[in-house]
Amino acid sequence: METPQPDKTGMHILLKLASLVVILAGIHAAADIIVQLLLALFFAIVLNPLVTWFIRRGVQRPVAITIVVVVMLIALTALVGVLAASFNEFISMLPKFNKELTRKLFKLQEMLPFLNLHMSPERMLQRMDSEKVVTFTTALMTGLSGAMASVLLLVMTVVFMLFEVRHVPYKMRFALNNPQIHIAGLHRALKGVSHYLALKTLLSLWTGVIVWLGLELMGVQFALMWAVLAFLLNYVPNIGAVISAVPPMIQVLLFNGVYECILVGALFLVVHMVIGNILEPRMMGHRLGMSTMVVFLSLLIWGWLLGPVGMLLSVPLTSVCKIWMETTKGGSKLAILLGPGRPKSRLPG
C-alpha cells in the first residue's frame, strides 16, 4: 500500500510569494540605478527608429547615432535651461502664493456663517498651503532631475544600447534553449513597447504644445512649465491628465479669478477628451493587451518601486512583464489575468 504524498501546493505558493517579495524589495532598494537604466532604455527605444531612418538612407550607423544623440542633447539642454529659469521664478513666488491664498481665505471666511462651517483661516491655510499643493510637481521634477543628473553616464548607456540592439536577436539565438519562442516574444515586446512609446511621445508632445499655446493665449504665467508638466504626466495613465491640470488652475484662481480658472480647466478637459479619449484609442488600439484595472494597479506598484519615473513608464514595464509571462511555462495563466476583457480560449492543461 502506497503512502499518500502530502499536497505541497500551498508550500509552492508561499515560496513563490516569498520570492516575489524579495525581488520587489531588491528593485526598490536599487531604484536609483534601475531608474537610470530605464531612462536610457526609454531614450534608446524612442531614438532607434530615427537611427534606422538614417541608416536606410545610406548613413553609417556610428554617424547616424552621433547625429541623433547630439540633436537630443541640444534639445534637452535648451529645454532644461528654459525650465530651470521658469521653475526658479516659480519657487521665488511661493510666498506671494501664500499671501494671496491667505487673502482669499479671509474673504471666504465672510461666507462661512451662511455655509454653517466653523474653521479659522489659519487652519484652512494649514490644510491648503500652496507649497503642499505643488508638492507632487516638485517631487516629479526632482525625481527626473535626479535621474538625469549623471548625463554623461546616461548618454553613454544610450549610445551603447543603440549599437548593441542589432546584435540581441543573434545572441539570444545561441544563448537560449528554445530561441524561436523567446525571440518571438522579445520581438513582440519590443514592437509593442516601441509602438506605444513612439505614439505616446507624439501624443504627449501634441498635448504639451496645445496646453502651452492655450495658456499663452490666456496670459497665464509659467505657461511653458505647465505645458512640460502636461507633457510628462500624459505618460501617467488615468490620473496624469487630472494631476497636470491642478497646479495651473490653482495659480489662475489665486491671481486671475474664477472665470479664468474655469477656462483653464476647460482647456485641459478638451485636450484630454480629444487626445486621450479619441485619438489615443484609435491610434493605439489594444496593442499592449492590458485591462484598465491592471494599468491603474501597475501605476501604483511601479510608482512605489521606482518613484515618478516608474509612474511614467508603468505601462510599458507591465507590458514587458506580461509578454515575458506568456512565453514562460508557469506564467501564461497569470498573463491571461492581466489581459483585457474575456479570454477567447482556454489554455491547454
Swiss-Prot record:
GO biological process: one example: transmembrane transport
Q: Name one GO cellular component term.
A: plasma membrane
Q: Which UniProt keywords apply?
A: Cell inner membrane, Cell membrane, Membrane, Transmembrane, Transmembrane helix, Transport
Q: Which Pfam families match?
A: AI-2E_transport (PF01594)
Which loops or segments lie on the Periplasmic side of the membrane, by the record? Answer: 32, 84-142, 230-234, 279-292
The membrane topology noted for this protein in its Swiss-Prot or TrEMBL record is: Multi-pass membrane protein
Give the chief site where it resides. Answer: membrane
InterPro entries (UniProt xref)? AI-2E-like
Compartments where located:
Cell inner membrane
The record places the following residue ranges in the Cytoplasmic compartment, namely 1-10, 54-62, 164-208, 256-257, 314-349
Bilayer-crossing regions? 11-31, 33-53, 63-83, 143-163, 209-229, 235-255, 258-278, 293-313
Q: Which family does it belong to?
A: Belongs to the autoinducer-2 exporter (AI-2E) (TC 2.A.86) family.
**Do you know which NCBIfam families this protein is assigned to?**
PRK12287.1 (NF008930)
Its protein name is Putative transport protein YhhT
Q: Which organism is it from?
A: Escherichia coli (strain K12)
